[in-house]
Amino acid sequence: MTIFVKYFSYFFLTILLVSGCSSIPNKATPELQVVSYVDIERYLGKWYEIALYPNWFEKGCFGSTAYYEKLESGQIRVTNQCRMHGPEGELNEAIGNADIADNKTNAKLKVQFFWPFKGDYWIIDLDKDYQYAIVSEPDRQYLWILSRSQNMDVQTLKTLKEKIRNKG
């Protein structure tokens, strides 16, 4: 066996072991819970992004919004928009479709912006009047606080951040 093949084999085995271990669930963090029910018709419409966990696909975005509309097919059209690097920046838009993944609660969706990749969209907190929502995904890598209005009062935002901390 050549040295290259030997080292490549060790490298490949190490990658397999590391990736296998990374998929083992963390027992210390409880499973993320979604809200008990979402009336999709009330959830549709425009939402403003108030806060988020930073992510690569919104880098440089300012004034982000999400617009949800129901299509005849039953899918939900998702239109995300932001201005790049400030309020007068170039408009950036991403359009995708979402399917309800849990018909019991309507709180778990699968969103697809480009084929074949789909992402989880879990509604983990929702105002009874549908004025704000917290959205995340099972691994807690992404999170957004959304509001029906462009601004949120400081106390409500503080309360929502505390809810997020309590959810782990």
Residue map of PLM features:
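A beta-rich soluble binding module of mature secreted/lumenal proteins
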Residues: 15, 20-168
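Bacterial N-terminal signal peptides that target proteins for export
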Residues: 1-11
